[in-house]
From Swiss-Prot:
It holds the Pfam family GrpE. Keywords: Chaperone, Cytoplasm, Stress response. InterPro entries: GrpE, GrpE_coiled_coil, GrpE_head. Signal peptide: none annotated. The lineage of its organism: Bacteria, Pseudomonadati, Pseudomonadota, Gammaproteobacteria, Enterobacterales. Homodimer. Belongs to the GrpE family. Participates actively in the response to hyperosmotic and heat shock by preventing the aggregation of stress-denatured proteins, in association with DnaK and GrpE. It is the nucleotide exchange factor for DnaK and may function as a thermosensor. Unfolded proteins bind initially to DnaJ; upon interaction with the DnaJ-bound protein, DnaK hydrolyzes its bound ATP, resulting in the formation of a stable complex. GrpE releases ADP from DnaK; ATP binding to DnaK triggers the release of the substrate protein, thus completing the reaction cycle. One of its GO terms (molecular function) is protein-folding chaperone binding. One of its GO terms (cellular component) is cytosol. CDD domains: GrpE (cd00446). It is found in: Cytoplasm. This is Protein GrpE 2. GO terms for biological process: protein folding.
Amino acid sequence: MDNKENKLDEKKIFKNNKIEEKKENLIDAITVQNQKIENLKLKLLQNQKKINDIELRKLANIENIKKNTEEKIEKIKKTEIERFLKSIIPVIDSLEDILNLSTTVDIKDQPIIKGIELTLESLLNILNKLGVKIEGQKNKVFNPDIHELVSRELSKETLPNHVISVNKKGFTFNKIVLRKASVIVAEN
C-alpha cells in the first residue's frame, strides 16, 4: 500500500501543483488586466482633461469673437455717426449764410427767415443733446487742435493769441474734431 499511497500522494501533489499553477496564472492574468484597467483609467482622465481644455479654448474663442464683433460694431456705429454729423455741418453753414445774408439785404423780419432761425436753433439743440460741441468762440485762447488759423491781426480789445472773430464754426463730437473752426487770432 505504500506504493499506492505514494502514488496517491504524488497525484495530490501534482494536482495541488496544477491548482497552484492555475492560481498563479489567474493572479498574473488578473494583475495584467488590472494594470490594463489602470492604464485605461489614466488614458480616460487624460482624454477628459484634453476635452476640458478644448471646451475651455472653444469658450474663450467664442468670447473673443463676441468681444471683437462688439468692438467692430461700435467702431462702425461711431464712424457712421461721425459721417452723418459731418454731412450735417454744410446744412448748418447754409442756414447761417442765409441768416447773415438776410441781415445784409434787410429781410430779417420776414416769416421765412424766422422759420430758418427756428430750424437752425432746433438743429443745433439736437446736436448739442447728442454731444456735439460748437467750437470757435470769441476771446478764447487759440488751440490748433480745434481751430484753423485764417489770419492774425492786431487788436486792442482782444488778448494776444486769442480769437478775434470766427469765420466758420467748428464742431467736435466725443473729443473727435468734425471740423476745425476757422478763426482770426490776435497777434502778440
